[in-house]
Every structure is written in C-alpha cells, then in structure tokens.
C-alpha cells in the first residue's frame, strides 16, 4: 500500500518502508548506515539510502497518525508524564550566520535556556507527553524561547480525568486550577525551594 503519489511505483511500498523504519527504531538502530548494513539481501535492492531518507521524511504525517492510533489503542491512562528537551540547531556563537528556516518567524529557531544544563542554546524545544510505560501519546516542536507552561494549552484539548506529572518548568497555580476546573486534569509538579510550605 502506498500513501504517496509517485510517478514510478517504488519496489518497496510505503507500508514496508514505515515498518522498516519503526523496526530500526525498536532495535535502537539510530543511523541509516547501521540500518543498511543490517538489511537482508532481499530488501537491499528495493530501496536506496537517499530515496529511503527522502520517502521517510515525506511519510512523517502517516507515521505520526499511526503513532497516535497506537497510543490511543493502548487506552486512556490515569497517569501521564510531560517534559521538554532542547534541540540545538547550531552553537550560539554561529546563530547569526545560521539560515535554517529563518524565512518565517513562526518556524525560525531562536535562543533558549536549558535550566538543567544551566546554559543557553540556539534552536527549538521538543515538548512531549508519554504514559508511564514510555509510549509517547503526543509531542510538539516550538521555538526555544517558548516556556514549557504554554504547552499545557495543547494538553487541555486532548486529555481529561487524569494526572499529569511534570518538572518545575510546569509550575503554575493558575494553570493547575484551569486544567482541573475544565478537564479534571491534576497537574503534579514538585515545589521550588523558595516556595511557601516547601519541604526537602
């Protein structure tokens, strides 16, 4: 089965390519070179590395749809974990020369701060929600300067009647009240040291 409209019918179908990609992720193969070394002899002539990479990018929407369907077939959970991580595009000293996605402000990378590493970086921020077993149910990419707390607006539209565990970056009494009053989402966040009633 093929999702993409291609002039020449590929030897490896889109479903096979997605299956190959997901299998490589499951096997913790994180480079294409390692993947193509492990491919069986009958699969090697069906796809070239450059074509594989291009088709894989074009099939992202279908992979994401599959991931969401899998996440929801696992079923609604009582507990979820929300977190974010930096995605550095280039070193901060080279950010003025970087031309990656700078045509539109909405997609342009920018300067952000990563508290756990205590440093600034240039790029994006990946926000993700997963269940306790580690299966991702949702993720989003934002500019690096976007505060973690703003991702909770997305959570409000997708989840209800659950507990979400987050780090101190998601600490906001207003957001906690809003999530609970509208969707019965309990946001559990550790207290900061300078907070009232803090216990070590």
What are the language-model segments listed below?
Residues 1-200:
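Short alpha-helical elements
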């Amino acid at each position: 089965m093929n999702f993409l409209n291609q002039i020449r019918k590929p030897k490896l179908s889109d479903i096979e390519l997605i299956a190959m990609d997901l299998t490589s992720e499951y096997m913790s193969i994180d480079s294409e070179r390692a993947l193509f070394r492990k491919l069986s002899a009958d699969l090697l002539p069906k796809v070239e590395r450059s074509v594989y990479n291009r088709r894989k990018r074009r099939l992202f929407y279908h992979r994401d749809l599959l991931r969401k369907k899998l996440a929801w077939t696992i079923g609604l959970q009582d507990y979820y974990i929300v977190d974010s991580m930096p995605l550095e595009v280039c070193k901060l000293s080279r950010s003025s020369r970087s031309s990656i996605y700078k045509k539109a402000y909405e997609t342009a990378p920018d300067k952000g701060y990563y508290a756990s590493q205590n440093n600034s970086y240039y790029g994006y921020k990946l926000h993700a929600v997963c269940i306790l077993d580690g299966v991702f149910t949702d993720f989003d990419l934002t500019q690096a300067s976007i505060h973690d707390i703003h991702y909770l607006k997305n959570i409000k539209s997708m989840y209800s009647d659950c507990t979400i565990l987050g780090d101190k970056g998601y600490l906001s009494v207003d957001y906690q009240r809003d999530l609970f009053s509208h969707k019965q989402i309990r946001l559990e966040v550790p207290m900061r040291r300078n907070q009232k009633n803090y216990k070590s």
